[in-house]
């Protein structure tokens, strides 16, 4: 069975939030094809997020690092949010493995959010239904779009190419190769949910930089023919 998913490279992500804003834009405008939900955020564009980027500082000062961690629905192969839904609103598509919510059936009971160990579901305070990442199901299944554009908006928007999209069950796909060759891992596999989304780990980069290289090559103060300061008053000494 096809299992579409995201692979996110934590070594490349710079935390710019382009994926977050593009997700908001796509899921509120619908400029290129029918949406599964015509207005997923209702009147408040700040309310519900399908995708978030969490930023952490790790290590002990002064040897610290900043880690940006994008997080959304992982489209698990064994999604715990599906069997707990009393109305059948939460379901997993058999053709591509994407986990979705039928808003017409959802009663906002939050059972799915309690069952999800990743905190990927949020209650839309205005529509009173649970919402989450859909992998831009309207884009990836829209035959009117070119193959290049049939990807989630967050993937297309990422300036660092930190987000990959494809079939993790296809061993020859871009995502499968990245997982295999670059040590891709699942988030909390001990829960037995078999998350389809994977992360590529951060890699330690060691380099030696000469102090001289930290100074801009076009810095005029590096010129040897500068006139020595005579001690006379200059504009820099004037209190404005």
From Swiss-Prot:
Cellular compartments per GO CC: plasma membrane
Predominant location: membrane
Cofactor-binding details, from the entry: Binds 3 [4Fe-4S] clusters.
Keywords attached to this entry: 4Fe-4S, Cell inner membrane, Cell membrane, Electron transport, Iron, Iron-sulfur, Membrane, Metal-binding, Repeat, Transport
Subcellular location: Cell inner membrane
UniProt GO molecular function: 4 iron, 4 sulfur cluster binding; metal ion binding
CDD domains noted in UniProt: PsrB (cd10551)
Topology with respect to the bilayer: Peripheral membrane protein
Keyword Endoplasmic reticulum: no
Alphabetical list of InterPro entries matching this protein: 4Fe4S_Fe-S-bd, 4Fe4S_Fe_S_CS, ET_IronSulfur_Cluster-Binding
Record-annotated 4Fe-4S ferredoxin-type domain positions: 4-34, 64-95, 97-126
Organism domain of life: Bacteria
Positions with a binding annotation for [4Fe-4S] cluster: 13, 16, 19, 23, 73, 76, 81, 85, 106, 109, 112, 116
Record-linked PANTHER family: PROTEIN NRFC, PROTEIN NRFC HOMOLOG
Protein name: Sulfite dehydrogenase subunit B
